[in-house]
C-alpha cells in the first residue's frame, strides 16, 4: 500500500492542515475576546491586595446613581475618604489630611493622624480648587460655537512619598512655576462620579476600587515606591473631563510626569490598553500579567474615529504628562445604562484591571531617569516630562505576551522592505533565467533555433490571471453583502456580530474556492500557487507604500499588520521561486520532449493492435478552449510541430503514444493530475512552509483588529453613526483574513465549501430577518425632560432611531392619546428627537410638594431657577448675572448674543492651557458648583468686536424685574438659563424616566441626553 506524504500538496493534506491551523488560530482569538482570565482563588493573592475588600467597595460605591449633581455623589466622596483612612491606619502609616485647592490659596491642616514633619502619605480633600476656560474646540477636536465653563472641584488625592522624592512638604513652597519636583512622580487617576442613568460599576467604580487597592499595595511594609505616587479620585469626568481639568490649579500639578488613567468605556470584559503617549511609557505595560490592547485603538482616537474621550486627553495633550489609558471597552450597549452595575460585572474583570495597572504603576515608579527633564517641544506650560520617544506600536499575543516597538523602527522596517524585497526577487529571477529554469511567463521553447517551426509548449503562463479575477469576484460579492445588510437590516450587527462575521467569511471562502478550483479543474497549472504569490506580493508592496507614508507623515501606527504581511509574503514568494531550481532546464526538457515525440511519431507509423483504441481528442479540444495560454504543454499525444493538425496522424500512432505515456512516466516525478509534465519534479512539501508563514501572523494580527474594531463600532449606528462602516470593516477583514488561503485553496476538498455554503445561507437568512436587539444587547435611547418654568409645562424627549423610538413610546402609559412630535436631532446627527407632553409624569423637584401631593399650578417650578441682572454704570455693554438653582449644582447660560468676555466671582480666572477664548465670543456658559446654595455671580461684557479683555466693574445699579425686557433691548443682554437635575435615585423625583425603565420593552435601555435628566428652562 502506497503511503502519501502527510504534508504533500494534495487534496487531503491541504484540506486537513488549513482547517486545523485556522481553527487553532481563530478559536483562541475568540476565546480571549469573549472571556476574562479568572480571578485568583485566594482573596489575597499577594500582600497588600484584598479582592474581597475591593468587591465590597465596588458594591458600596455603586449602590445608587451618583452623578456629580446628586447627593449620593457626596456620599461616595466621603466613603472614599473613609476607606483611605482605614487602609492607612491598618498599614500603620504616618499620614496627614489636608484641605487644599488653588495654588494661591493658603493650605491649612485639617486633621492629623500619626503626623510627622515629613509624613509618608498625605491625603488631600480638595474643596477649594476651581477652573475656568473658554474654547470653540470640542472634546473630539471639532470646531463648535464658543463655550465657557466654570467648575468647582471636589477631588480626593493621596500622595505616597517615594524613596527618591524631595523631602518635606514641597507643595507648600508657593511656587507657581512648572518644574520637576525631585524626579517627578506617577499619577494614577480614576473618576468617582457616574452618569445620571448608570450605576458606574465599570465607569468608573472599578477604577476607583483599583486605586484603593493600589494604595493598600504601596503602603504595605516594604513596598514604598521609588518615585512618589499621586492617587487621584476626580469628580465631574462625565460632564466634560472636569475633575481632571480642575487639577490644573492643584499645588501638586507639577509633581507627576507620568500617569496611568483607569477608565470604563464599556461595561465589563477585559480592560484594554486604549492609548499610550509613546514607546517608552508603553513598555511599562509589558509587565502586565494579562496584557490586552493594540495601537489601533490609539490611532482611532487620534483620527477622531472614536466618538468619546477620557481623562487621558487632559493628562497627555493639555498637561504634557506621559502615560497609559487602561479602560473597559465592551459591551457597549450597557455603557451609561442601568446595566453598568455589579450584577453585570465580575471579580475577574476587576482583577484584570487591578493586576495590570499595579504592574504598570510599579514599572513607571521604578524608572527614575526616563520621564523627567526638558521637553522636546519646549512648551513651558506643560510638565517637564522628558523628551518624548518615538510613538509606540503595540499589540498583545493571545493575552499573554505583549509586543512593543517604536514607530520610527516600523518605518525603517517598511522602507527596507520596499527596497530590498523586490530587489531580491529580481535577483532570483535573474539567476533562474541564467540557469534556464524560469518557468514563469514561458510560453514555448524553440529546440533548434529561434523561429523554428517545431517549438515545444511550456505552459508557463497558465494560471497567471486567475487570482485577480477570483479575488475581484469574491471580494465584490463580500462587499455587496455589506451593502445588502445596511439596506435590509442595518442594526443586526448591534447584537449579532458573529452571525455577520460568519456570513461574510463563508461567502468569501466559497466564492474564492469556486473560481480558483473551477479554473484549476478546467485547465490545471502547477504554477497557480506561484502566480498567486506574485500577485499577493505586488498588492502588499503597493499597500506598504501607503503604510510607510502614513507612518512618516501622519504618525499612524495601525498599518503594522501590512508590514508583517508583506514580510511573510516576501519570504513565501521567495520559496515559490526557489522551488524552480528543482526543475530541469527548460531547453533540456524541451529537447527531451522533442526527441520523445520524434520517436513516438516513427513508432506510430507501424501498425499495432492498440490501433483499435480511439484517440483522446476531447481533452485536446478542452485545452484549446482555455484563453490563458494558447499553446499546449508537450505531452506524449502532442504533435511535434506546434500548431500542427493532429488529424493527419493515424489511429495507430495516437494509440501507441497513449501506451508509451503510461510506460515512460515514472511515478517518482508524476505531475499532479493533468498539470504540466515538467512539474512532477516540483517539491510537494514546501506549501506547508508557505502556509505557516502566511496564515498565523496574518490571522492573529488582522483577527485582533477586526474583533476590536467591530466591538468598538457595532453600537455606533444606534448613536446615529454609519453602520456601513462596521459592515465594511467586517467585509474587508474577512477578505484579508482568508486571503492567505488563496495559493492553496484549489486543493481543498469540495466538502468544505459545501458546508460553508450552508453556513452562509443560514446566517444570511438570519441576518436579514432577525430582530437586532435583545435583553442582553439593548438599544440605547437618550432621555431628557424639559420644564418651562414660566408656565409649568413639561415635555419628555426621547432621542434615537425613529422606528425604535416610536415602538418604545407606544408602550408608555403616559403617552396614551398624546401627540408625538419627531424632528431631526441637532445634538446627534442621524437620530430623531421625539417629544410628548409630560404633564402626566411631572418631575417632583425641590419644593414641588404641597400637603404631600404634586402641585399643579403653573407656578410650581418658578422657584427652581432665579436670575438677577445688574448693569454696570460705567458701560452699557457690561452687566452682572446672579444665578441660582434650587437643589442643583449645574446650570447653563445660553446668550442670545455672544459675550466677548466673562468672569466668575471667586474664580482663578481664565486658564489658557484649557483653551483660547474664541474670537467670535462665547455663546453659552456652563456653571458647576460644589455646594447646593451659593449663587454664581457672572460678570459679562459684549461688543461688536468681541474682544477679550478684563472685566472691571464699578458701582453696580440693580435692575428690577420690570426693567429686564427694556435692558434686553437697550443693553443687549438676554438669553436662556437651563439648570440640570440628575438625581433619579428616588423614582418619584423623575417619574417619566422611571416609567421608561419600567414599561419599555426589554430590548430598550435609557441613557442621559444632557448633563441632567431634567432641565428647567427660564428666559432672562
From Swiss-Prot:
Protein name: Vacuolar membrane protease
Residues at the catalytic site: 237 (proton acceptor)
UniProt region (Disordered), positions on chain: 609-648
Matching InterPro entries: Fxna-like_M28_dom, M28_fam, Peptidase_M28, PFF1_C, PFF1_TM
Main subcellular location: membrane
Gene Ontology MF terms: metal ion binding; metalloexopeptidase activity
Listed cofactors: Zn(2+)
Cofactor binding note of this UniProt entry: Binds 2 Zn(2+) ions per subunit.
Residue positions binding Zn(2+) 1: 191, 203, 263
Gene source species: Verticillium alfalfae (strain VaMs.102 / ATCC MYA-4576 / FGSC 10136) (Verticillium wilt of alfalfa)
Vacuolar side of membrane: 33-410, 489-491, 551-561, 712-724, 772-1020
GO terms, biological process: proteolysis
Function: May be involved in vacuolar sorting and osmoregulation.
Range of residues in the leader sequence: none
Gene Ontology cellular-component terms listed: vacuolar membrane
Cytoplasmic topological domain: 1-11, 432-467, 513-529, 583-690, 746-750
Enzyme Commission number(s) from the entry: 3.4.-.-
Site for Transition state stabilizer, residues: 335
Protein's membrane topology: Multi-pass membrane protein
Bias kind Acidic residues: ranges: 618-631
Amino acid at each position: 500500500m502506497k503511503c502519501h506524504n502527510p504534508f504533500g500538496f494534495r487534496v487531503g493534506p491541504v484540506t486537513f492542515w488549513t482547517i486545523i491551523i485556522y481553527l487553532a488560530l481563530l478559536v483562541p482569538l475568540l476565546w480571549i475576546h469573549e472571556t476574562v482570565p479568572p480571578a485568583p482563588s485566594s482573596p489575597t493573592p499577594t500582600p497588600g491586595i484584598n479582592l474581597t475588600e475591593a468587591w465590597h467597595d465596588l458594591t458600596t460605591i455603586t449602590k445608587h446613581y451618583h452623578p456629580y449633581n446628586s447627593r449620593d455623589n457626596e456620599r461616595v466622596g466621603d466613603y472614599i475618604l473613609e476607606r483611605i483612612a482605614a487602609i492607612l491606619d491598618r498599614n500603620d502609616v504616618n499620614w496627614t489630611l489636608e484641605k487644599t485647592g488653588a495654588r494661591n490659596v493658603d493650605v491649612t491642616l485639617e486633621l492629623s493622624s500619626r503626623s510627622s514633619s515629613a509624613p509618608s502619605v498625605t491625603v488631600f480633600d480638595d474643596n477649594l480648587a476651581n477652573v475656568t476656560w473658554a474654547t470653540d474646540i470640542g472634546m473630539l477636536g471639532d470646531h463648535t460655537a464658543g463655550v465657557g465653563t466654570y467648575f468647582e472641584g471636589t477631588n480626593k488625592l493621596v500622595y505616597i512619598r517615594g524613596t527618591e522624592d524631595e523631602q518635606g512638604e514641597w507643595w507648600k513652597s508657593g511656587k507657581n512655576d512648572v518644574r520637576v519636583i525631585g524626579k517627578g512622580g506617577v499619577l494614577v487617576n480614576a473618576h468617582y462620579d457616574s452618569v445620571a442613568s448608570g450605576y458606574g460599576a465599570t465607569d468608573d467604580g472599578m477604577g476607583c476600587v483599583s486605586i484603593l487597592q493600589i494604595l493598600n499595595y504601596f503602603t504595605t511594609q516594604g513596598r514604598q515606591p521609588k518615585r512618589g505616587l499621586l492617587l487621584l479620585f476626580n469628580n465631574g469626568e462625565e460632564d466634560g473631563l472636569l475633575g481632571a481639568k480642575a487639577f490644573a490649579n492643584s499645588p501638586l500639578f507639577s509633581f507627576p510626569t507620568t500617569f496611568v488613567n483607569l477608565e470604563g468605556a464599556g461595561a465589563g470584559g477585559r480592560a484594554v490598553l486604549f492609548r499610550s503617549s509613546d514607546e517608552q511609557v508603553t513598555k511599562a505595560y509589558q509587565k502586565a500579567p494579562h496584557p490586552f490592547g493594540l495601537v489601533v485603538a490609539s490611532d482611532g482616537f487620534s483620527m477622531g474615529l472614536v466618538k468619546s474621550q477620557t481623562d487621558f486627553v487632559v493628562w497627555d495633550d493639555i498637561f504634557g504628562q506621559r502615560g497609559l489609558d487602561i479602560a473597559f471597552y465592551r459591551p457597549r450597549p450597557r455603557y451609561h445604562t442601568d446595566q453598568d452595575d455589579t450584577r453585570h460585572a465580575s471579580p475577574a474583570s476587576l482583577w484584570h484591571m487591578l493586576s495590570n495597572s499595579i504592574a504598570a504603576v510599579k514599572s513607571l515608579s521604578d524608572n527614575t531617569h526616563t520621564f523627567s527633564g526638558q521637553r522636546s517641544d519646549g512648551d513651558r506650560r506643560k510638565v517637564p516630562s522628558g523628551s518624548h520617544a518615538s510613538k509606540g506600536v503595540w499589540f498583545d499575543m493571545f493575552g499573554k505576551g505583549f509586543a512593543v516597538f517604536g514607530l520610527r523602527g516600523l518605518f525603517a522596517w517598511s522602507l527596507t522592505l520596499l527596497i530590498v524585497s523586490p530587489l531580491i526577487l529580481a535577483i532570483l529571477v535573474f539567476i533562474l533565467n541564467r540557469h534556464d529554469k524560469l518557468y514563469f511567463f514561458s510560453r514555448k521553447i524553440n529546440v533548434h533555433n529561434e523561429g523554428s517551426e517545431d517549438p515545444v509548449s511550456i505552459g508557463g503562463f497558465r494560471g497567471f490571471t486567475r487570482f485577480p479575477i477570483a479575488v475581484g469576484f469574491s471580494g465584490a460579492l463580500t462587499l455587496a453583502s455589506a451593502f445588502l445588510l445596511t439596506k435590509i437590516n442595518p442594526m443586526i450587527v448591534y447584537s449579532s456580530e458573529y452571525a455577520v462575521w460568519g456570513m461574510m467569511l463563508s461567502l468569501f471562502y466559497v466564492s474564492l474556492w469556486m473560481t480558483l478550483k473551477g479554473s484549476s479543474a478546467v485547465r490545471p497549472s502547477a504554477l497557480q500557487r506561484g502566480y498567486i504569490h506574485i500577485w499577493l506580493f505586488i498588492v502588499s508592496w503597493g499597500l506598504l507604500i501607503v503604510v510607510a507614508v502614513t507612518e512618516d507623515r501622519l504618525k499612524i501606527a495601525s498599518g503594522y499588520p501590512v508590514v508583517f504581511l508583506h514580510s511573510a509574503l516576501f519570504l513565501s514568494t521567495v520559496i515559490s521561486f526557489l522551488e524552480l531550481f528543482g526543475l530541469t532546464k527548460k531547453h533540456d526538457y524541451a529537447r527531451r520532449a522533442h526527441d520523445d515525440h520524434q520517436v513516438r511519431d516513427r513508432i506510430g507509423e507501424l501498425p499495432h493492435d492498440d490501433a483499435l483504441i480511439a484517440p483522446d481528442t476531447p481533452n485536446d479540444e478542452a485545452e484549446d478552449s482555455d484563453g490563458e495560454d494558447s499553446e499546449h504543454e508537450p505531452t506524449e499525444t502532442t504533435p511535434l510541430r506546434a500548431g500542427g493538425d493532429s488529424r493527419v496522424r493515424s489511429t495507430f500512432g495516437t494509440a501507441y503514444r497513449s501506451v508509451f505515456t503510461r510506460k515512460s512516466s515514472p511515478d517518482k516525478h508524476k505531475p499532479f493530475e493533468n498539470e504540466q509534465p515538467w512539474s512532477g519534479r516540483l517539491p510537494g512539501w514546501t506549501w506547508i512552509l508557505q502556509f505557516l508563514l502566511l496564515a498565523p501572523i496574518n490571522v492573529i494580527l488582522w483577527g485582533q483588529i477586526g474583533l476590536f474594531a467591530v466591538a468598538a463600532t457595532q453600537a455606533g449606528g444606534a448613536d446615529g453613526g454609519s453602520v456601513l462602516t462596521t459592515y465594511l470593516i467586517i467585509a474587508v477583514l474577512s477578505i484579508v483574513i482568508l486571503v492567505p488561503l488563496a495559493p492553496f485553496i484549489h486543493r481543498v476538498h469540495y466538502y468544505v465549501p459545501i458546508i460553508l455554503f450552508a453556513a452562509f445561507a443560514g446566517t444570511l437568512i438570519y441576518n436579514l430577518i432577525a430582530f437586532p436587539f435583545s435583553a442582553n444587547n439593548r438599544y440605547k435611547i437618550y432621555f431628557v425632560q424639559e420644564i418651562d418654568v414660566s408656565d409649568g409645562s413639561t415635555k419628555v424627549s426621547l432621542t434615537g432611531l425613529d422606528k425604535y423610538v416610536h415602538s418604545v413610546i407606544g408602550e408608555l402609559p403616559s403617552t396614551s392619546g398624546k401627540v408625538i412630535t419627531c424632528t431631526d436631532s441637532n445634538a446627534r446627527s442621524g437620530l430623531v428627537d421625539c417629544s410628548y407632553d409630560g404633564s402626566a409624569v411631572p418631575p417632583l423637584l425641590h419644593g414641588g410638594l404641597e400637603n404631600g401631593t404634586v402641585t399643579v399650578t403653573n407656578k410650581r417650578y418658578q422657584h427652581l431657577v432665579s436670575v438677577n441682572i445688574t448693569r454696570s454704570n460705567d458701560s452699557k455693554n457690561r452687566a452682572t448675572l446672579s444665578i441660582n438653582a434650587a437643589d442643583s449644582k449645574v446650570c447653563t447660560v445660553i446668550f442670545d448674543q455672544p459675550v466677548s468676555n466673562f468672569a466668575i466671582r471667586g474664580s482663578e480666572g481664565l486658564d489658557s492651557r484649557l483653551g483660547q477664548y474664541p474670537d467670535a465670543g462665547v455663546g453659552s456658559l456652563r456653571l458647576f458648583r460644589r455646594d447646593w446654595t451659593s449663587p454664581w455671580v457672572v460678570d459679562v461684557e459684549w461688543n461688536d468686536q468681541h474682544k477679550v479683555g478684563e472685566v472691571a466693574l464699578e458701582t453696580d445699579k440693580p435692575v428690577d424685574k420690570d426693567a429686564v425686557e427694556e435692558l434686553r433691548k437697550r443693553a443687549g443682554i438676554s438669553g436662556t438659563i437651563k439648570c440640570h437635575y440628575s438625581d433619579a435615585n428616588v423614582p418619584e423625583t423623575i417619574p417619566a424616566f422611571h416609567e421608561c425603565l419600567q414599561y419599555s420593552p426589554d430590548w430598550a435601555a435609557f441613557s442621559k441626553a444632557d448633563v441632567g435628566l431634567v432641565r428647567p428652562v427660564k428666559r432672562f
